[in-house]
Amino acid sequence: EITTFAALTERFNLPNGNYQRPKLLYCSNGGHFLRILPDGKVDGTRDRSDPYIQLQFYAESVGEVYIKSLETGQYLAMDSDGRLYASQSPSEECLFLERLEENHYNTYKSKMHADKDWFVGIKKNGKTKLGSRTHFGQKAILFLPLPV
């Protein structure tokens, strides 16, 4: 017996998404949480109680997100050299393509540098990885969004 369902014909006018609850981005490479510091520096820390690791995600469109520090109010950004930094206001450098991979980890690719495949990445020592040094398949680019 086959059950069929009617196609959904309603349209929903929803505002640009905000993932409601803050998240932590846990990197599988070295066990670091992505941290956005007040001085504009971005790195990783293993300290789960660090206030600078609480992040708010905002969807610009499907699969495109801004990542903002709850503590500093700054946005994660990647410059033209592939360096991660904190920006005071959202810009093109702050948009990332969020993708759920087959291994259930998320990756965040710079939209501005999508043609170069530059990802957000954290090295085992907690320092950020240059976008130009990242590529698909590296543990440094795999993140688990966790509840605060």
From Swiss-Prot:
Heparin binds at N29. GO terms for biological process: angiogenesis; branch elongation involved in ureteric bud branching; cell differentiation; fibroblast growth factor receptor signaling pathway; mesonephric epithelium development; positive regulation of angiogenesis; positive regulation of cell division; positive regulation of cell migration. SUPFAM superfamilies: Cytokine (SSF50353). Belongs to the heparin-binding growth factors family. Residues 123-139 are annotated as: Heparin-binding. One of its GO terms (cellular component) is extracellular space. The lineage of its organism: Eukaryota, Metazoa, Chordata, Craniata, Vertebrata. This is Fibroblast growth factor 1. Gene3D superfamilies: 2.80.10.50. It is found in: Secreted; Cytoplasm; Cytoplasm, Cell cortex; Cytoplasm, Cytosol. The keyword Cytoplasm applies.
